[in-house]
């Protein structure tokens, strides 16, 4: 019997981040180049990873920030540059 308490959540987080990236590109590539969305995603992900005390919520935070940037029409706000 497998120990259900021995779960590697980092794999789950990485899969979630990959899916979020792919979904954002699919949804917004008609307004922004896919590579630009990917670069902004990587930047936002790095910001959250560098500042995280607990990494469990990084996918949710990255998705929320990227969605806000995409909706605003500005992937690179002046405060982020």
Regions found by a protein language model. Name each.
Residues 2-81:
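Charged, amphipathic alpha-helical regulatory modules used
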């Amino acid at each position: 019997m497998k120990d259900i308490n021995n779960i590697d959540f980092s794999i789950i987080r990485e899969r979630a981040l990959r899916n979020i990236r792919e979904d954002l590109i699919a949804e917004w590539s008609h307004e922004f180049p896919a590579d630009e969305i990917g670069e902004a995603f990587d930047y936002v992900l790095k910001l959250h990873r560098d500042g995280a005390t607990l990494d469990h919520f990084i996918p949710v935070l990255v998705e929320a920030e990227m969605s806000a940037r995409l909706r605003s029409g500005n992937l690179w706000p002046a405060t982020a540059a």
